[in-house]
């Protein structure tokens, strides 16, 4: 089996985790599964926000082409970076058990985000995080801040900004949880749909791969992400739209909280939903329709 992945430390850590789980599930030797790192346009373009150069697809196009061509058997992704519409013939077939979905703040002087002094600078390239920062702390200057985890932490250490945000899950997978100075409450600072979950993309109808992947599917994560990605898809979510959403599963019940914001954070509309897990996708779609109705028909005009 060949696994395609981006070449960053985090992407490779996620691919190695997937390989280990496959080995454990099927008793496979390490050399039975090959990891193929690939460079993507999103990795090469570091000087502009994703919203200006093509959105989330920049991190997946080359890998998905390799999957369609049969050069790899599966692709391992951070689900929050995946578009809701995938290339024909491909699907996100399995989600691994979710890590902590919260956003982590790493502060250089103030340890807690809300304790930053007036006029402090915070680095982030995520429109959702930028909008939430401006909503909660309009006095803070938000600067565009791209690069992999190491690059962002190095910029922070160099004093370019007073703090930055990263996904808690990614830091934990890299063994860097000790750099976190504050974990944001998702009811106040809601994460991106899919944040903290590893998604495995494969070819539709590839029965051999489906059998191998089946033991890796985590029930609660699969259900939660069906709801979150339905919400995102119904709102045409991309890197151009500040959208947050988190679903939690307890037994046969699901709870969801979603939010849409303007990039300046001045307007925000929040929606909640509860129901049975079998209706996960429908709950997400309904929540999207309700929050769109709250916001009005012109909410996305001019900045999407």
From Swiss-Prot:
Write out the pathway annotation from the protein's UniProt entry.
Answer: Porphyrin-containing compound metabolism; protoporphyrin-IX biosynthesis; coproporphyrinogen-III from 5-aminolevulinate: step 2/4
Q: Which residues carry this modification: S-(dipyrrolylmethanemethyl)cysteine?
A: 239
Q: Quick one: a GO biological-process term for this protein?
A: protoporphyrinogen IX biosynthetic process
What Gene Ontology cellular component terms go with this record? cytoplasm
Domain of life, source organism = Bacteria
Q: Name one Pfam family in it.
A: Porphobil_deamC
Its keywords, alphabetically, are: Porphyrin biosynthesis, Transferase
Cofactor note as given: Binds 1 dipyrromethane group covalently.
**Note in the entry:** The porphobilinogen subunits are added to the dipyrromethane group.
Q: Which PANTHER family match?
A: PORPHOBILINOGEN DEAMINASE
Q: What does this protein do?
A: Tetrapolymerization of the monopyrrole PBG into the hydroxymethylbilane pre-uroporphyrinogen in several discrete steps.
Return the protein name: Porphobilinogen deaminase
Taxonomy-wise, where does this protein's organism fall, top ranks first? Bacteria, Pseudomonadati, Pseudomonadota, Alphaproteobacteria, Hyphomicrobiales
